[in-house]
């Protein structure tokens, strides 16, 4: 428990909860029948089922991103029709409190009126120019002003693209080929990163992916997250050969796993000593833990940063940036080639600008911390009350919990979680009108639109479901 105490001391809420096992009554007939509903109330996902079955004939697995298929939690994938604020409605008319937030972008709430109004005005002028637009300058300046490591930025269309660009950049700048990443960290689906990856790869139980040639990953070294000694050993064994260390400063794609107090400092020191670069993948944490991202929150400045999600306000976007001398390697300023047809399109720039404007308002991150803390404390408390071994934590608007005693410091710890129990919990919460990420190995997100009432309803639902499972 010393690790948990240290995490709390550094401003991170980690609460392992152990409770004795208790006997439970047999499941009710309604639960067995509905698989997602605890009560005899009307809860149907018939239209979702019909649409999803049709989708499976049209798209691989019926989805365009694997985790949406509910493979790891079971039950019927939900087809959504509309969103607003902190709530979502499916095609059957069911309403849910949302803690996925489109996997992170919806930090100010879904379908924000001001963002939508700005998008309508931009839309009147066109959706994409394939040429420079003034809005790129505005968002670029906002990003550069906010993120400590970024002196120049390149916009792309996804977090995966951002990490692909950053990977090529660090190799071009250093003249080295090897990279070091951490087990369970996900940096998109580029070949070089699909080694002991998290996110959907973890959900499917695949250590990597067929179709990735050995040559693509021969230069990818891996270490356990939060293990500075393992990193130092890899640098000793590969002296002068590692181009960069890539990491999620707070892991979100193996569940929510914060760094130990000295870990990020150790990475900064070892990379500087060896002439390697430090890359923070802030696609998830950027503008969520603080306006300047995890690097502002922890006070550690990397050399290169990747961004996505929030900076597009819900539209497809990504970015990578860093020191000016590094970024000037990127074409057309330098020889490292990277391009994109829709990069910097006016719609994504508009949504990003107006989302960041909202995040600049006083009290934003204090509010996120308040509601998220209430949520996590509430769920862990009812977990203990109902006899479940659970642990979890949060930083500002990012959170997670595991059905394990904890503490969870790395991917191996995360894999000790009872994923079958999480699946039952997830299905039960759907029946109670709460939408959580359909995988134990994904972080959750709150927004400025979440209310105390949302949190109270969620905790009440969690207690009900936990008593069932």
Swiss-Prot record:
Gene Ontology annotations of biological process type: chlorophyll biosynthetic process; protoporphyrinogen IX biosynthetic process
- Please give the pathway this protein is involved in: Porphyrin-containing compound metabolism; protoporphyrin-IX biosynthesis; 5-aminolevulinate from L-glutamyl-tRNA(Glu): step 2/2; Porphyrin-containing compound metabolism; chlorophyll biosynthesis
Q: Which cofactor does it need?
A: pyridoxal 5'-phosphate
Pfam families attached to this UniProt entry = Aminotran_3
Give any Gene Ontology cellular component.
chloroplast
Q: Which domain of life is it from?
A: Eukaryota
Q: What is its main location?
A: plastid
Write one Gene Ontology MF term.
pyridoxal phosphate binding
What family is this? Belongs to the class-III pyridoxal-phosphate-dependent aminotransferase family. HemL subfamily.
Q: Which SUPFAM superfamilies match?
A: PLP-dependent transferases (SSF53383)
Q: Please give the PANTHER family that the UniProt record associates with this protein.
A: GLUTAMATE-1-SEMIALDEHYDE 2,1-AMINOMUTASE (PTHR43713), GLUTAMATE-1-SEMIALDEHYDE 2,1-AMINOMUTASE 1, CHLOROPLASTIC-RELATED (PTHR43713:SF3)
Q: Which organism is it from?
A: Hordeum vulgare (Barley)
Q: Which residues carry this modification: N6-(pyridoxal phosphate)lysine?
A: 309
Question: Transit peptide extent?
Answer: 1-34
Q: How does it assemble?
A: Homodimer.
Known EC number(s)?
5.4.3.8
Which compartment or compartments is the protein found in?
Answer: Plastid, Chloroplast
Task: State the name under which the record lists this protein.
Answer: Glutamate-1-semialdehyde 2,1-aminomutase, chloroplastic
Which gene codes for it? GSA
Listed A to Z, the keywords are: Chlorophyll biosynthesis, Chloroplast, Isomerase, Plastid, Porphyrin biosynthesis, Pyridoxal phosphate, Transit peptide
Q: Which reaction does it catalyse?
A: (S)-4-amino-5-oxopentanoate = 5-aminolevulinate
């Amino acid at each position: 428990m010393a690790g948990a105490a240290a995490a709390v001391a550094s401003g991170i809420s980690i609460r392992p909860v152990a409770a004795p096992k208790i006997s439970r009554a047999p499941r009710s007939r309604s639960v067995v029948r509905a698989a997602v509903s605890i009560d005899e109330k009307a809860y149907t996902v018939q239209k979702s089922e019909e649409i999803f079955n049709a989708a499976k004939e049209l798209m691989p697995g019926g989805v365009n991103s694997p985790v949406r298929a509910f493979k790891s939690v079971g039950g019927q994938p939900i087809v959504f029709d509309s969103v607003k604020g902190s709530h979502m409605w499916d095609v059957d008319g069911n309403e849910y409190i949302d803690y996925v937030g489109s996997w992170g972008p919806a930090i100010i709430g879904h379908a924000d009126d001001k963002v939508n109004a700005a998008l309508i005005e931009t839309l009147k002028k066109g959706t994409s120019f394939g040429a420079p637009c003034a809005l790129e300058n505005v968002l670029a300046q906002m990003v550069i002003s906010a993120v400590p490591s970024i002196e120049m930025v390149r916009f792309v269309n996804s977090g995966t693209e951002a990490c692909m660009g950053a990977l090529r950049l660090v190799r071009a700048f250093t003249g080295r080929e090897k990279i070091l990443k951490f087990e369970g960290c996900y940096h998109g689906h580029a070949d070089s990163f699909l080694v002991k990856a998290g996110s959907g790869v973890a959900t499917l139980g695949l250590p990597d992916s067929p179709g990735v040639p050995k040559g693509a990953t021969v230069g990818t070294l891996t270490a356990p997250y939060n293990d500075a000694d393992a990193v130092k050993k890899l640098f000793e064994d590969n002296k002068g050969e590692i181009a960069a260390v890539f990491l999620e400063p707070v892991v979100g794609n193996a569940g929510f796993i914060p760094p130990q107090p000295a870990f990020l400092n150790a990475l900064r020191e070892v990379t500087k000593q060896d002439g390697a670069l430090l890359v923070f993948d802030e696609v998830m944490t950027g503008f969520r833990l603080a306006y300047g991202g995890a690097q502002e929150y922890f006070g550690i400045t990397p050399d290169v940063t990747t961004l996505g999600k929030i900076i597009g306000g819900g539209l497809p976007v990504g970015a990578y940036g860093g020191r000016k001398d590094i970024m000037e390697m990127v074409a057309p300023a330098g020889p490292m080639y990277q391009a994109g047809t829709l990069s910097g399109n006016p719609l994504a720039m508009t949504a990003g600008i107006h989302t960041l404007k909202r995040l600049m308002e006083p009290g934003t991150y204090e509010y996120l911390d308040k509601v998220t803390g209430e949520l996590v404390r509430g769920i862990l408390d009812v977990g203990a009350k109902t006899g479940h071994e659970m642990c979890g934590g949060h930083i500002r608007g990012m959170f997670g919990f595991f059905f394990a005693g904890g503490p969870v410091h790395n991917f191996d710890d995360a894999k000790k979680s009872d994923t079958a129990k999480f699946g039952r919990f997830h299905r039960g919460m759907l029946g109670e009108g709460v939408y959580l990420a359909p995988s134990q190995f994904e972080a959750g997100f709150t927004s400025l639109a979440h209310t105390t009432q949302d949190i109270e309803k969620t905790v009440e639902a969690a207690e009900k479901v936990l008593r069932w499972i």
